[in-house]
Amino acid sequence: MSKYLFLSATDLEHNELEMFGSKIHIIGVGKINAAMNTTRLIEKYDPDCVINFGSCGNLKDYKIGEVLTVGEVFNNIDVRPFAEYGHTPFHGLGSFKLQGKADIKCFSTDQFYHKHRKDYAEK
C-alpha cells in the first residue's frame, strides 16, 4: 500500500484535515519553509508520494480547482555569466536522484505573476 504525504502552506488552502486517512501537514509559506518542512516530513514518514495542495499563479486561464502538474520550470534563476538566464550550471546534466528514492520532480517559488508581468515570466 502506498504511503502519501499531503502538504499545504496554510490551512486556508484546503478544507480537510485528512485525505485518504492521512493528515494534511501545514508546512508554511515560501520556499524556505517548504524545503525545510517537506524534508523533515519526508525523513519522518518516508512516503511513496508527496502531494502539495495550494494556490498557484498562472498566465493562462485555468479555473480554480483544476489540477496542474509540473513538468519543467525555470524560475528565480539568474546566475549569468555562469549559465544562460533561467538555468543553472547543472542544467542538462540529467536527473538527480536522492539515495534510495525514485525519480523526483520538485518546484517552488515565491514570485507572484500576473498577466501584466507576462514579459518577465517569459524571459
Task: Kindly give the residue locations of the regions a language model identified.
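Glycine-rich phosphate- or other oxyanion-binding loops that anchor nucleotides, phosphorylated ligands
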Residues: 4, 8, 12-123
